[in-house]
């Protein structure tokens, strides 16, 4: 039985050996030597074991080379990923710095423009107040001049009282009818003087009252303008505070958006790495291969090639 089995197996073995010799590039002399050495069943089994060991060695070597290539590829991918992440972070930082610089320049320009407007308004108000002060000074000077003029006029009128028509009539009456007495004469003169003075004072008070009313009207107008300017200044302050709050809120939103963007980029990079790892596992496989003579014999030509 053993001999019959050996005769049946030998042609197949010799055929496989010739195929292996042809695929591996063996010479005809080596093929003849191999055929001469595999005549017996024990020698055939021994040779099969040697071939199996060679196949294991080849598979192990191939696995080691594949692992080394995978490690090198992984290291290259990680280095490239780190480089891209660093470049992306650098670009993001540059873009953020540029955006913040543009916002700062815009805010500075707006603040300078508003400051220029406030400065212009202040200068105009200063000129207006200076003019108003000058007008008040001129009005007071006119009042002083007018009072001096009134005083001079009053003195002149005192002189004219003595020479007035009533005094002349009074003297004529004394000449015609006699003197009523020194006491009554003095009383009449005093009464006449008081009447003249009261009339003059009434006229002066009426004029002063009209001037005072005009001054009060001007003061009311100036107070109204002052209140309006104060309200405008308060409105500008509130608007400036609101714009500052909006600027702070926009800065916070920008930082929050930047953090979210960085998280999203990190998540995308992580998903990309997981995708590459899954693809690598799907192509190469992670589990160690079980040695099978039939499967390894079928894969041998592919590996040798």
Curated annotation (Swiss-Prot):
UniProt keyword annotation of DNA-binding present: no
InterPro entries (UniProt xref): MTUS1/CCDC69
Name assigned to this protein: Coiled-coil domain-containing protein 69-A
One of the record's GO cellular component terms: cytoplasm
Coiled-coil annotated spans: 42-281
UniProt keywords, alphabetically: Coiled coil, Cytoplasm, Cytoskeleton, Lipoprotein, Myristate
Ranges where the record places region Disordered: 13-38
Molecular function GO terms recorded: microtubule binding
Upper taxonomic lineage: Eukaryota, Metazoa, Chordata, Craniata, Vertebrata
BP-aspect Gene Ontology terms: spindle midzone assembly
């Amino acid at each position: 039985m053993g001999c019959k089995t050996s005769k049946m197996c030998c042609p197949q073995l010799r055929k496989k050996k010739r195929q292996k010799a042809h695929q591996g590039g063996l010479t005809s002399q080596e093929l003849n030597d191999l055929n001469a050495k595999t005549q017996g069943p024990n020698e055939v089994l021994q040779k099969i074991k040697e071939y199996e060991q060679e196949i294991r060695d080849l598979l192990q070597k191939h696995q080691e080379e594949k692992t080394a290539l995978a490690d090198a590829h992984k290291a290259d991918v990680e280095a490239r990923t780190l480089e891209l992440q660093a470049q992306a972070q650098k670009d993001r930082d540059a873009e953020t710095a540029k955006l913040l610089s543009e916002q700062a320049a815009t805010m500075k320009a707006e603040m300078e423009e508003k400051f220029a407007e406030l400065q212009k308004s202040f200068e105009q108000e200063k000129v207006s107040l200076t003019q108003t002060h000058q007008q008040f000074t001129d009005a007071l000077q006119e009042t002083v001049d007018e009072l001096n003029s009134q005083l001079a006029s009053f003195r002149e009128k005192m002189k004219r009282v003595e020479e007035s028509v009533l005094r002349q009539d009074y003297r004529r009456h004394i000449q015609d009818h006699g003197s009523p007495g020194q006491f009554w004469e003095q009383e009449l003169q005093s009464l006449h003087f008081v009447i003249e003075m009261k009339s003059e004072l009434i006229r002066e008070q009426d004029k002063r009252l009209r001037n005072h009313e005009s001054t009060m009207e001007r003061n009311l107008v100036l107070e109204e303008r002052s209140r309006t300017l104060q309200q405008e200044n308060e409105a500008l302050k509130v608007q400036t505070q609101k714009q500052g709050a909006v600027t702070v809120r926009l800065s916070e939103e920008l930082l929050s958006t930047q953090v979210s963007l960085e998280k999203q980029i990190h998540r995308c990079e992580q998903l990309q790495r997981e995708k590459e790892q899954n693809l690598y596992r799907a192509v190469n496989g992670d589990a160690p291969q079980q040695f099978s003579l039939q499967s390894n014999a079928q894969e041998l030509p592919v590996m040798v090639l």
